[in-house]
Structures are given as C-alpha cells and as structure tokens.
C-alpha cells in the first residue's frame, strides 16, 4: 500500500511538474511573440476593416439564393461575435454603413475587397510569426489561400446559420422537453467557434500542425471566447466607464476593446497549439544539475547553419525546425535571436541565416558567458535530446570542476563574512 501511495505521489508530482514546465514554456513564447501588442495592432486594423468585411461577406452570400432570406440572421450572427454588448445603436450605424456600400462603383467594391485581403494577410503573417515561419508563402499560394477564405468563409457562416435555423424549426421548436432542447441548441454557437478556430489553427500556419493539437486549441479558444463575451457583457452593463467618459462616442472604444479581447483569445489559442507541437519536457528523474544549459542548442543551430553555408546554401528557420540535428525545437527562436544579437549570425536578404563571426576566434567560453539563462531550462534539468548527449563528457568535466572548486563548507564562508563585518 505504501509503495503504491509513493508511486501515485511520484506520478502526480511528475504531472504537476510537466504541466508547470509546459505553461512556463507557453508563457515565455507568449511574451516573446508580444501577443498583447499584436492583438492591439490586429484590433485596430479589424476596426477599420469591419464594415468592408461585413459588406463583402453579405455581398458574397447574395450570390446564393438560399441565403437571401437569412440576411438579418447572418447579420445578427456577426454582431454577436464582433459586438456582443453594444446594443441597437451600433447595429444601426453599421447597417447604415453597409447599405451605403451597395451603391459603390466597381472600383469602390474592389477597394473593399483589397482592404479585407490586407486584413487576412495580416492575420496570416501574425499566426506564422507565432510558428516562427521565416519563409513566407509563395504569392500564388498565398493569394489562393486568402481568396478561399474570403469566398468560403461567408458560405461557412451562412451554412451555420441556415443549419441552426433548420434544426430549430424542425426539431427544437415544438414537442416535449422544449426547455432542454433550447439549452442544447444554445451550445451550437460554441460548436461553430470550435470549428472556426480549429480550421484557423490547422490551415493558416505554414507548418504541419497535428489534428489533435489544432482541435485542442480550437476548444480552448472557443471556451475563452465565450468567457470573454460573458465578462465583457457584464463589464459594459455594470461599469459604464466608456459611456461615462466618451458619452455618445463610447460605442467606438467599446467596440475596439471587444475586438482586442477577441484577438487576445485567438492568439492565445495559437500559442497553445504551437506549444503542444514544440514543447518537449526535460527528463530529470534525479534532478541532476546541468551546468551546460543552452550550450547544446546553440551549438546545434550553429552547426546546421555552418554546414548549409559550406554547401553553398543558407539555412532557414523552416529548415531548422525540420532538421533532426537542430536540438530542442522549442528553443530555436530564442537561440537564433541570441546569436543574431551577439553578431554571430545575421539574416540574409532572402530570409536565410548566415555566419557573421570568425568561429576560429570565438571560444565556447565566450559563448557560454553570454548565454541568457532565463531563455533555457530554468530548473537546471538535463535535456536528454540527441544534441545534448554529445556534450555529456564535457558536462561531467564541468560538473566535477565546479564540485572541486566549491568544496568550501558554508560555515567557513559565514565566519569569513562575519569577521569582515566586525
């Protein structure tokens, strides 16, 4: 019984330690990618693109007669997601603006489409920055993706609203257990959000994303999205700060604040999906101290860039992620930034990486003394990856040297300090 209890405690401790390491890794990337700043930039661009986006969406849906009678429902669907607590004032303004776009000329209509495409392009670039994609999509491939999103996105929204309406009138509108059926139907928007976020995380990054990771990120983002909607509605109804300060103009900052929250949720889900794919916990059963934290990863990146340079080509971030010899992939972005900041690597005109320093003149000690410790395993555990194992002999020597140099009893240090103070 005691052995089983110890095993359970050990397993629980391992799960807690691994979860803590995962969220610590996710938080480091969250800060490194400046998610809050990126969300603000996207929120501002979305605010400027909101009317063109809704106008283009409704215009595309007009092409399909089946969606013609659902204009009001589709508009309400978009308002619930872009402005859940703004009331009829904002709806009135936006419907007025959208109706005016119908009288635009062909050039004006094309300009609206260009604005929306720029927004989609910014979203694509921001998400790919999270996945540390150094090489952008080819122009034809990128245009095809953006145009597909622009044309099929509204169809997806219309289909969701149409399916919800059909299910409501055919199954839920009458019959027994009407209250329970209505409650079940209330979860349909959450399901739509899960699907939308899943497709966003699965298709937009120019990386291979696992199905389960994208689905988990979609679920997390959908839950956070619903919580954000409820909190924002409560905030606006209970604390009328914006209305008190801005008066009739309060609808603009409130709308901007809500769109900002939306993008924070979207990018947080993206960071979660990225972390699921690239986090690798250090194996540390005995919690043995590693005096060479970060060295294997830095040397592995340098080796990959050097070998590519010798072969007449340049290493890219995408190739580094795909390489099995580049060390812990979760740290690649930090390693490359560190090497560039210290003048050892530089970025070429076409986005590749090249050696800047004379590697004959730079020693391992020079590199070691400049390593930013906070970017690596803060717990001091040994990473047992292939790039780390080759440093085991050197690691043992350094550990032994430290052990020999630090055999001084603490009482000696305390007494020396006391004597000097007196």
UniProtKB/Swiss-Prot annotation:
<comment type="similarity">
    <text>Belongs to the UPF0761 family.</text>
</comment>
<feature type="transmembrane region" description="Helical">
    <location>
        <begin position="247"/>
        <end position="267"/>
    </location>
</feature>
<dbReference type="InterPro" id="IPR017039">
    <property type="entry name" value="Virul_fac_BrkB"/>
</dbReference>
<keyword id="KW-0472">Membrane</keyword>
<feature type="transmembrane region" description="Helical">
    <location>
        <begin position="47"/>
        <end position="67"/>
    </location>
</feature>
<keyword id="KW-0997">Cell inner membrane</keyword>
<keyword id="KW-0812">Transmembrane</keyword>
<feature type="transmembrane region" description="Helical">
    <location>
        <begin position="103"/>
        <end position="123"/>
    </location>
</feature>
<dbReference type="GO" id="GO:0005886">
    <property type="term" value="C:plasma membrane"/>
</dbReference>
<feature type="transmembrane region" description="Helical">
    <location>
        <begin position="214"/>
        <end position="234"/>
    </location>
</feature>
<keyword id="KW-1003">Cell membrane</keyword>
<feature type="transmembrane region" description="Helical">
    <location>
        <begin position="143"/>
        <end position="163"/>
    </location>
</feature>
<protein>
    <recommendedName>
        <fullName>UPF0761 membrane protein CT1325</fullName>
    </recommendedName>
</protein>
<keyword id="KW-1133">Transmembrane helix</keyword>
<dbReference type="Pfam" id="PF03631">
    <property type="entry name" value="Virul_fac_BrkB"/>
</dbReference>
<feature type="transmembrane region" description="Helical">
    <location>
        <begin position="12"/>
        <end position="31"/>
    </location>
</feature>
<feature type="transmembrane region" description="Helical">
    <location>
        <begin position="184"/>
        <end position="204"/>
    </location>
</feature>
<dbReference type="InterPro" id="IPR023679">
    <property type="entry name" value="UPF0761_bac"/>
</dbReference>
């Amino acid at each position: 019984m005691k052995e089983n209890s110890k095993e359970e405690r050990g397993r629980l401790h391992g799960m807690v330690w691994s979860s803590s390491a995962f969220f610590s890794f996710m938080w480091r990337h969250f800060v490194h990618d400046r998610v809050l700043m990126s969300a603000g930039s996207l929120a501002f661009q979305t605010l400027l693109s909101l009317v063109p986006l809704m106008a283009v969406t409704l215009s595309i849906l007009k092409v399909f007669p089946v969606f013609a009678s659902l204009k009001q429902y589709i508009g309400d669907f978009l308002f619930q997601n872009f402005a859940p607590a703004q009331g009829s004032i904002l709806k009135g303004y936006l419907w007025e603006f959208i109706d005016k776009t119908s009288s635009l000329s062909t050039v004006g209509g094309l300009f609206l489409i260009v604005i929306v495409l720029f927004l989609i392009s910014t979203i694509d670039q921001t998400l790919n920055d999270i996945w540390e994609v150094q090489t952008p999509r080819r122009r034809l491939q990128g245009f095809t993706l953006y145009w597909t999103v622009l044309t099929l996105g509204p169809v997806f929204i219309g289909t969701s609203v149409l399916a919800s309406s059909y299910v409501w009138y055919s199954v839920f509108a009458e019959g027994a257990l009407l209250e329970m059926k209505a409650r079940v139907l209330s979860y349909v928007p959450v399901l739509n959000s899960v699907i939308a976020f899943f497709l966003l995380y699965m298709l937009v990054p120019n990386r291979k994303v696992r199905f389960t990771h994208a689905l988990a990120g979609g679920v997390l983002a959908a839950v956070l999205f619903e919580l954000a909607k409820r909190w924002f509605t409560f905030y606006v109804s209970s604390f009328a700060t914006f209305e008190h300060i801005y008066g009739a103009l309060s609808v603009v900052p409130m709308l901007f604040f809500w769109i900002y929250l939306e993008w924070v949720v979207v990018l947080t889900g993206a960071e979660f999906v990225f972390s699921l794919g690239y986090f690798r916990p250090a194996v540390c059963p005995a919690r043995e101290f590693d005096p060479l934290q970060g060295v294997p990863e830095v040397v592995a990146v340098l080796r990959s860039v050097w070998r590519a340079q010798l072969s007449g080509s340049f290493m890219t971030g995408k190739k580094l992620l795909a390489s099995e010899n580049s060390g812990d992939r979760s740290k690649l972005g930090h390693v490359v930034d560190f090497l560039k900041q210290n003048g050892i690597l530089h970025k070429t005109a076409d986005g590749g990486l090249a050696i800047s320093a004379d590697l004959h003149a730079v020693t391992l000690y020079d590199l070691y003394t400049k390593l930013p410790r906070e970017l690596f395993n803060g717990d001091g555990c040994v990473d047992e990856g292939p790039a780390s194992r080759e440093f085991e002999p050197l690691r043992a020597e350094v550990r032994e040297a430290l052990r020999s140099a630090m055999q001084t009893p603490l009482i000696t240090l305390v007494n020396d300090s006391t004597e000097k103070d007196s």
